[in-house]
From Swiss-Prot:
Belongs to the parvalbumin family. Has some calmodulin-like activity with respect to enzyme activation and growth regulation. Binds two calcium ions. Ca(2+) 2 binds at D91, D93, D95, K97, E102. The gene is OCM. One of its GO terms (cellular component) is cytoplasm. PROSITE patterns: EF_HAND_1, EF_HAND_2. SMART domains: EFh. One of its GO terms (molecular function) is calcium ion binding. The keyword Methyltransferase does not apply. This is Oncomodulin-1. The keyword RNA-binding does not apply. It holds the Pfam family EF-hand_7. The modification N-acetylserine is found at S2. Residues 39-74, 78-109 form the EF-hand domain.
Amino acid sequence: MSITDVLSADDIAAALQECRDPDTFEPQKFFQTSGLSKMSANQVKDVFRFIDNDQSGYLDEEELKFFLQKFESGARELTESETKSLMAAADNDGDGKIGAEEFQEMVHS
């Protein structure tokens, strides 16, 4: 699966442009601009599986660091503060990782 199978390349490019500089990544803005927030719960879970590098069923901080690169290979890494903020926004049960349900809830919040 390619991310452009489910999201428009133009929308992805626009979303990445908005957070090009370090410490400018805002999850909800990214989800809206990329079109992710308009997708069904099942489609969001498909994107989650694409982002889940090790197919563990969870996203940890290391995977989140490379979140933008899953949308475009040349994109920047998230900063440590952006990574921690993204984790805090989605990790509802406080276990230090984001499951598919938590990810879907964050995207649609």
